[in-house]
Amino acid sequence: HLFDGGAARTNLSFDAAPVTKLSKPGLVSETVVAQDGPGASLVYCATRRETERMAEALAAIPLDAAAYHAGLGRETRHKVLDDYLSGRLTAIAATNAFGMGVDKPDIRQVIHADVPGSLENYLQEAGRAGRDGAPASCRLLFDPSQIEGHFQRQSQNRLTRREIGRVLKALREMAQRFARDGEIIVSVD
């Protein structure tokens, strides 16, 4: 069976708040503590170091929290993920390495401690909140002094229309050369 839930997620509320590097751990902690009722919190961070810093701030509350990123050993990552999915951890601070294939329906809040790489990333990551249909919140924290530089770096990473055209032309030539019928599927991240 295939079910289409549509794109509208009326159970999610969104807000954004300015933050500085110094005030960020406190604001993340306040946001997590202010959550009403049971459920988990997910804090997305841009770097491994920042996940460690946010997890330490949450653990100091004290709160059952841990960091999750690709730099952790495989066993540690599996344990953190298992503890989070089972409810032994109420909060996790993670890079975008967390998420693909992870289904935890009771995430009550997703906090972006850093501005994500793209709007698509933000929507996908924020969409991990409230998958059970219950109310959930999505909060984006941003450092006003770093916004301009962030978007300049992002714009430099984008392919130009001309470069995309070259890629498509090369793919078409490849398809003709190998005499393949059907479609060529390309994923660009």
Predicted regions and their residues:
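Helicase motor core with emphasis on the C-terminal RecA-like subdomain
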Residues: H1-D189
